[in-house]
Amino acid sequence: MRRIRRGHVLLAAVAAALCLPASGVSSSSDNSTITKVGKTEGQLNLIAWEGYTYKQWVNPFVKATGCKVRSKFGGSSDEMVTLMRTGQYDAVSASGDASLRLIFGKDVRPIDPKLVPDFKNFIPALKSPSHNTVKGVHYGISLQWGPNTLLYNTKKVKPAPNSWSVLYSSKYKGKITVPDNPIQIADAALSLSRSKPNLGIKDPYELTEPQFKAAVDLLKKQHSLVRKYWATAGDEIDLFKNGSATVGASWPYQTNTLQAAKAPVKDLIPKEGATGWADTWMISSKAKHPNCAVKWIQWVSTPKVQAQQAIYFGETPANTKACAIMDKLSKGSCAQYHANAPSAYFRSIKFWKTPTKDCGNGKSNCMDYAKWQQAWTDIKS
């Protein structure tokens, strides 16, 4: 998935210079759990979404730790996985559609969450989520998250929708927009879990062949109704501003940006619930600067940095203590991004995770991510 706030990707140059490992965490290829942090190495090479390494919180980190941050912005989850497997980077801000690929590929190391003091303040749903925690082992620390919401033009879409079914309705042919992402198959599966309960869909990311086929068929029917598959938040904002789209799958950032521009839009979590993304900082099993990587995770988990990033990028912090700081930085932002939402809100969200053959019931007859990628190409053809 492309997780870019603005309309294009900026690539930051990453130097190839590598420092010798310091004591503490070993920097050799290692999949053992990180349980302590030693002397920092003076450098940190990151793969991140654009906006995740902004100077507002990076510069104070460098000053406090001596770890100079060099970041490369990833254009998609697939690109991030590829970059991590080069062994040239220390950590990555992986979304849920990438994290399990890195875990099962042994590309990342487990980390003891006790190393992160603010972990205790995280929302329960993001302490040990299935997209970064396997059999009780934490392969990263959650960072920020956001739901996939149903966005609509209040003047054009009437009555106000309460179901994802509106995205599959011929009534709005040519005015529908959805993300250009294979994980969109999960959104179709979530809709089918309510409209066709006989399919037996319990988890939209664990689909047997018949369930998968039903979701893909629904999306193929939707294809002729779609005005555009959007790649960035800016793409969708433009579609709603110029009237090309009146209803679509979205994120809170788009809604807030459009409402600030006085566009007649609202969003909601439909009755079926919603999918959602959640990012995790994960440390490479080949990290050359692992101690700096741990320090970075500790830093970006603090309430102040979480609040700064949430407002800058347009997302929701994992740390519940960030809410008050968000409102000080931008009045009402805590509620805007659901940082103070009740537990029922989180339960309605099915966070992204990489589809695998494992169906979670001891069987291995689910469709893996490669099948999802191929199907998405077929859907759009």
Give residue spans per PLM region.
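Short, low-complexity disordered leader/linker segments with a strong preference
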Residues: M1-Q43
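Early extracytoplasmic/lumenal segment of secretory-pathway proteins
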Residues: D30-L102
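Extracytoplasmic ligand-binding site segments that recognize negatively charged/polar headgroups
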Residues: I47-A48, Y52-K55, S93-K241
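Paired acidic/hydrophobic, glycine-rich loop segments that form the ligand-binding mouth/hinge
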Residues: D90-A94, Y229, T246-W251, D267
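Ligand-binding "clamshell"
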Residues: L102-I111, V134-V137, T257-I269, S333-C334
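Extracytoplasmic/periplasmic substrate-recognition and gating elements
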Residues: S250, Q259-Y312, S381
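Mature extracytoplasmic/periplasmic domains
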Residues: S284-K350
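Conserved C-terminal helix/tail region of periplasmic/extracytoplasmic solute-binding proteins
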Residues: F346-S381
